[in-house]
Amino acid sequence: MPSLHVFYGGTFDPVHVGHLAIARAAHAALQAPIALIPSADPPHRPTPGSSSMDRLRMLQLAVSKEPGLSADPRELQRAARQNRSSYTVDTLTEVRSELGPKTSIIWLLGADAFVNLSNWKDWQMLPELTHLVIANRPGITLQTQLPPKMATVFNHRWVQDPATLRKTPHGHLWLLNQHPNPSSASKVRAAISAAAHWEADLTPEVAQYIRTHGLYGIHDIN
């Protein structure tokens, strides 16, 4: 079976059970390991609420007992070396250079991120570097919510069978139909600051890390 390299990018601020559910579903559907890549401060989103090293450590803790999942620090390391903004297209260009032109590469992202892809740097280049696997999210219908300029680039690229992704190195889109989890990082952060229940949305190891390191203002509510 041809090899398949799958990368799941995000701020993971913090990583929660919804992220892990998507990664597990992709691992099962694609029969390939999933490398989760925490982004440096993303230019198109607010600055993360915890440091890059905290986000990486929480991600490492979250995947430590998850077969087939790993944390990949390459984007944080590159941002630290170059001291500049973080862009997915740069990460994928680096990955493509490492793996060569014939290797099948997948970038995994949620539907909520995908519908805003036109805000990303050089987003039109992504199909030349990778396949895109989009995890469905509640309330988002991709067929009707894509801006016209995105529809022009992507609508002819959808495939029904994920096996197709192994046959070519890049250029296709596939919808990962998984049971959407309502967890979100913003809700977790808000719950912590409001002294509401938040632990159920995280693994025990990540919850303990937040307590130990006083992240997201938790010391203010103890």
From Swiss-Prot:
Q: Name one GO biological process term.
A: NAD biosynthetic process
Q: Which residues form a coiled coil?
A: none
Membrane-spanning intervals of the chain: none
* Entry GO MF terms: ATP binding; nicotinate-nucleotide adenylyltransferase activity
Family annotation (SUPFAM superfamilies)? Nucleotidylyl transferase
Q: What family does the database annotate?
A: Belongs to the NadD family.
Query: What's this protein's name?
Result: Probable nicotinate-nucleotide adenylyltransferase
Q: Which organism is it from?
A: Xylella fastidiosa (strain Temecula1 / ATCC 700964)
**Gene that encodes it:** nadD
